[in-house]
Regions:
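Long, structured protein-protein interaction/assembly regions in large complexes
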Residues: 1-30, 34-40, 48-130
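Residues that form or flank phosphate/diphosphate-binding pockets in enzymes
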Residues: 51, 143-144
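Short glycine-rich, acidic/polar surface loops and turns
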Residues: 121-122, 144-146
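A short pocket-lining beta-strand/turn micro-motif at the edge of beta-sheets
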Residues: 130-132, 145
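Short glycine-rich phosphate-binding loop at a beta-alpha junction
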Residues: 134-135, 155
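Extended C-terminal subregions enriched in glycine
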Residues: 135-143
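Residue-level detector of conserved catalytic or cofactor/ligand-binding positions
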Residues: 146-148, 152-157
Length: 158
């Protein structure tokens, strides 16, 4: 291992194993982000490893945004189906959040109209993500992760 630190923590070893097992069962040209024993973002089937990494990074960011107290505290209407709840969360944390916050839409999903999850709030939450493992089924054809344009929080969490 080419690094000054020659010891890998047990949690990192576990996450590396999970990344490799996950990658074994995905399409070729795959990338996987793992945190705390679970795959949180997988990118596969794209034309380049750059695109796979970007896709996996976006999924990892979305996974972490779902852990934010502002998202966990959303109050859904009684009887909402799990798929509808999950889709509403995905839209809420994304760029098209007004699709679920607009008058006439939010009442079908939420008991109380949620506040907008601002870009600044998302950035502040994502900046707290640490200890993410990145696995790939092959080498990266570039030397610097900044070249692949994954989100800054995901890059810093690696």
């Amino acid at each position: 291992m080419v690094t000054e630190n020659k010891e890998i923590p047990e949690a990192a070893k576990r996450d590396l194993k999970i990344a490799l097992i996950t990658l074994k069962y995905t399409q070729s040209n795959s990338v996987c982000f793992v945190k705390d024993g679970q795959a949180i973002g997988v990118g596969a089937g794209q034309q380049s490893r750059v695109h796979c990494t970007r896709l996996a990074g976006q999924k990892a960011d979305n996974w972490f945004l779902r852990q934010c107290p502002k998202v966990l505290d959303l109050q859904f209407v009684d009887g909402i189906r799990r798929a509808d709840r999950d889709n509403a969360i995905d839209v809420y944390i994304g760029e098209e959040y007004m699709d679920v916050l607009a008058d006439g839409a939010w009442e079908k999903i939420f008991k109380v109209k949620p506040e907008v999850f601002t870009r600044e709030e998302k950035r502040a939450w994502l900046d707290q993500m640490k200890g993410v493992t990145l696995g790939s089924d092959a080498f990266f054809p570039f030397s610097d992760l900044s070249l692949i344009h994954i989100s800054e929080p995901t890059r810093l969490a690696l």
